[in-house]
Amino acid sequence: MEIGQYQPNLEGDGLRIGIVQSRFNEPVCNGLADACVEELERLGVTGEDVLLVSVPGALEIPLALQKLAESGQFDALIALGAVIRGETYHFELVSNESGAGITRIGLDFNLPIANAVLTTENDEQAVARMTEKGRDAARVAVEMANLTMALDQLGDDEDEEEDEDDEEERA
């Protein structure tokens, strides 16, 4: 049996991307942002199609993502941050709540969000992961923006067929 299959599309030309970056653990977050923006450019996204905003910490990321999503100006969003374990329960709280908020915004607004909020045991792990995680976030955002647009067209095609059927029935 032959089945239809969508091939991943990493062409970023014309895509509008919003990035929300935490300033807490700033050196790691700057490394994430640098790698992410560099990869977006490599994928064909232009600087004029990227907006980067910063927030104090990971718990503030979902609200900024929500405001960007509400604007309707973006094809995908990217969350960048670093939560590094300390000696208190705060690590679990920040990790879980920021992750849940990021996911909720994406689902509520039907908008892809690449979650590149690192959660690591120590600074060394965060530094070791920041470059590849930043690049990966760019690739995820571009691929998922293209995928959601392609899937949205499936629904548009079905709507057009229904409209044509309705017109034929009236004739």
Curated annotation (Swiss-Prot):
Binding site for 5-amino-6-(D-ribitylamino)uracil: F24, A58, L59, E60, A82, V83, I84, N115
Keyword field: Riboflavin biosynthesis, Transferase
Sections of the chain in a coiled coil: none
SUPFAM superfamilies with a match to the protein in the record: Lumazine synthase
GO biological process: riboflavin biosynthetic process
UniProt name for this protein: 6,7-dimethyl-8-ribityllumazine synthase
Binding site for (2S)-2-hydroxy-3-oxobutyl phosphate: E87, T88, R129
Keyword Transferase attributed: yes
One function term, GO molecular function aspect: 6,7-dimethyl-8-ribityllumazine synthase activity
The keyword Transferase is annotated on this UniProt entry: yes
Active site positions: H90 (proton donor)
Family, similarity comment: Belongs to the DMRL synthase family.
Acidic residues composition bias: residue spans: 154-171
Involved pathway(s): Cofactor biosynthesis; riboflavin biosynthesis; riboflavin from 2-hydroxy-3-oxobutyl phosphate and 5-amino-6-(D-ribitylamino)uracil: step 1/2
Catalysed reactions, as listed in the record: (2S)-2-hydroxy-3-oxobutyl phosphate + 5-amino-6-(D-ribitylamino)uracil = 6,7-dimethyl-8-(1-D-ribityl)lumazine + phosphate + 2 H2O + H(+)
Functional description taken from the UniProt entry: Catalyzes the formation of 6,7-dimethyl-8-ribityllumazine by condensation of 5-amino-6-(D-ribitylamino)uracil with 3,4-dihydroxy-2-butanone 4-phosphate. This is the penultimate step in the biosynthesis of riboflavin.
Span list, region Disordered: 150-171
A GO-annotated cellular component: cytosol
Pfam family, one: DMRL_synthase
